């Protein structure tokens, strides 16, 4: 069977990137079908970009391209493997990244297995802005060509085996090119805005949404000097480095500089703040990470020089990584970094290649 006659199942989200991915694969001669995943049972009404509207858009695109669209419900898997962990992390005072977990457990596990076993797929494809390259018999994950849209940060948990079974057609393009293709084809998704909500849950108001599942516990806001200057509505609504939504202005003694969250005392339900986005209490010289995933699946020992991102869209930070044991590493930055947040992911790179990453267990504060 020739490479180009192979069957690809495209994860159709109802967005422009997956729509154009399906068309690009058709142009490359693959046998293309779509799959729409429903991963959340609750419908919050028409004001949100609901699964029903997304499904209608996905169906319209598939009709236009002349391909079959399958649907599958992964709501149970999403609840058990993504959402419960997401809530547990917030409860513990950390700030998780559900999109990374969703890619790991749903898009590149449940979807990959379903496509291969139930639909006879040779490959799956998604609209992620990443690229793959085969080096020394292993598939590597590369940054997307469009540096503004690169999504490798969200896919660091993938193994080389999963990458080998996945295609990323728009990773070779820039976003404006993708929209232009969709417009030229007359696809309904051409001008649809990019989704920014929690993976699969949509554009709900975050505080309201989280409050349904975790009871909020108001508590004190104190400065780094120990002065009480306000009340927070729940630690879970705040993350390190956050400026908005604190409800405090300048103080009589302080400057007019804005306040930032510099620490969360979970045990005592206290939010600690300081003025200025470069306050020493916000800065870290490094971090400890755990729950490590390396794309090549080789255990990491010793030390290495590379770059790291501690959040999406951050400029790469040069660093030295040292193995502490099988599942923990110490990362020392070349220069102090602001707002390193436990629960988020640290993702490592060697040039264009995403090496893997782990969950930030603790930050190493700047000695004061």
Swiss-Prot record:
It comes from Escherichia coli (strain K12). Gene3D superfamilies: Adenine nucleotide alpha hydrolases-like domains, HUPs, Translation factors. Changing residue 199 to A: Abolishes the incorporation of sulfur from the sulfur-relay system; loss of activity. Disulfide bonds join 102-199. Pfam families: tRNA_Me_trans, tRNA_Me_trans_C, tRNA_Me_trans_M. GO terms for biological process: tRNA wobble position uridine thiolation. Keywords: ATP-binding, Cytoplasm, Disulfide bond, Nucleotide-binding, RNA-binding, Transferase, tRNA processing, tRNA-binding. Its main location: cytoplasm. One of its GO terms (cellular component) is cytosol. This is tRNA-specific 2-thiouridylase MnmA. Its EC number is 2.8.1.13. Changing residue 344 to A: Loss of activity.
């Amino acid at each position: 069977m020739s490479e180009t006659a192979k069957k690809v199942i495209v994860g159709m989200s109802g967005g422009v990137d997956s729509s154009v991915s399906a068309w690009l694969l058709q142009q490359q001669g693959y046998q293309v079908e779509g799959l729409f995943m429903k991963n959340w049972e609750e419908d919050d009404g028409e004001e949100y970009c609901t699964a029903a509207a997304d499904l209608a858009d996905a169906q319209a695109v598939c009709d236009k391209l002349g391909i079959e669209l399958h649907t599958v419900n992964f709501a149970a898997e999403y609840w058990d493997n993504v959402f419960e962990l997401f809530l547990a992390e917030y409860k513990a005072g950390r700030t998780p990244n559900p999109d990374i977990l969703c890619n790991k457990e749903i898009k590149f596990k449940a979807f990959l297995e379903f496509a291969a076993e139930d639909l006879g797929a040779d490959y799956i494809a998604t609209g992620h802005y990443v690229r793959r390259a085969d080096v020394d018999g292993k598939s590597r994950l590369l940054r997307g060509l469009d540096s503004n849209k690169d999504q490798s940060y969200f896919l660091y948990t993938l193994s080389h085996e999963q990458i080998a079974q996945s295609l990323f057609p728009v990773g070779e393009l820039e976003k404006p090119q993708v929209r232009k293709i969709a417009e030229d084809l007359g696809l309904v998704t051409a001008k649809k805005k990019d989704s920014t909500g929690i993976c699969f849950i949509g554009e709900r108001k975050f505080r309201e949404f989280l409050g349904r599942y975790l009871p909020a516990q108001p508590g004190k806001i104190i400065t780094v000097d120990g002065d009480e200057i306000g009340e927070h509505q729940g630690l879970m609504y705040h993350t390190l480095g956050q400026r908005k939504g604190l409800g405090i202005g300048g103080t009589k003694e302080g400057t007019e500089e804005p306040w930032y969250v510099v620490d969360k005392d979970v045990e005592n339900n206290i939010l600690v703040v300081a003025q200025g986005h470069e306050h020493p209490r916000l800065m870290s010289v490094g971090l400890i990470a755990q729950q490590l995933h390396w794309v090549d699946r080789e255990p990491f020992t010793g030390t290495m020089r590379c770059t790291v991102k501690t959040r999406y869209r951050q400029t790469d930070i040069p660093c030295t990584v040292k193995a502490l044991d099988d599942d923990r590493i110490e990362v020392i930055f070349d220069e102090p970094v602001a707002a390193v947040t436990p629960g988020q992911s640290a993702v490592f790179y060697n040039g264009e290649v995403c090496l893997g990453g782990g969950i930030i267990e603790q930050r190493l504060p700047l000695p004061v």
